[in-house]
Structures are given as C-alpha cells and as structure tokens.
A protein has these predicted regions:
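Extracytoplasmic/lumenal domain signature
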Residues: 1-125
Length: 125
C-alpha cells in the first residue's frame, strides 16, 4: 500500500516516525545522543524530476548532471549535517573542504571524528 504519512506504513509494512529529504548524499552517519550526524557530497539533484527530464530529452538536464557528478568527485568538498533523531529536522550544517570516506565517522566525548578521502582525520567539537 501507499504511505499514510507520518507514522504510516510503506509498501514494506515498516512504521516510519519521519521521512525527510536532506541536501547530502550520506557516506558516513553516526548517532550521538539525540542528533544524527551525516557527511558526504552535496545532493544537488531531484532524482524524480531529473529522470523525467531525461525521458523528455530535455538537454538542460545535462549541465545539472555534470554538476552532480562534479560533487560526487569531490570538486565541491562535502557537507556535515546534524539532524534531530526524533523529528528529522535539520539542526545545522558545515562545509567540509574534502569528501569523507565511506563509513569514516565516529562520535566520542562530545566530538565528531571524520576521515577524508585525502587521508586526513578531522576532529570537530
């Protein structure tokens, strides 16, 4: 069946507390108390709209796809996003100079540690 909204069921029969689009393609994620931290390249593309434009042979979509590819390659750095675990609302975000590695984030003692594709470790407080 269709999702019945907040707290509804999706086709898999799983209860959802919330469902939010976020402006990052999460490569790393960690929960610290009531905050979910996600890090990755920016997500500049609305996939459903883009797919329809490709079907419609809209040539203007090529530039957007090239921009998203550049983001995936790390040309725009990354984003660290903080999200409330209870509501899904974005709390804050910062720009990272480099892309995080896959699953390369940890939280401990009030700090976030992120490893980057260029071999650095970043500590944020």
């Amino acid at each position: 069946g269709k999702s019945s909204g907040k707290g509804g069921r999706n086709a898999g029969g799983v209860e959802h507390n919330w469902n939010e689009d976020i402006p990052v393609l999460a490569r790393s994620m960690v929960l610290a108390k009531d905050t979910i931290f996600l890090a990755g390249p920016p997500d500049n593309t609305d996939e459903e709209d883009t797919f329809q434009r490709i079907i419609d042979r809209d040539k203007t979509v090529d530039a957007e796809l090239a921009e998203q590819d550049a983001a995936l390659q790390g040309k725009h750095g990354g984003i660290l996003l903080a999200v409330d675990k209870n509501t899904g609302k974005q709390l804050s975000s910062i720009t990272l100079q480099e892309l995080p590695t896959w699953d390369g984030m940890a939280a401990a003692n009030g700090k976030i540690f992120i490893t980057t594709e260029k071999g650095k470790v970043i500590c944020l407080e």
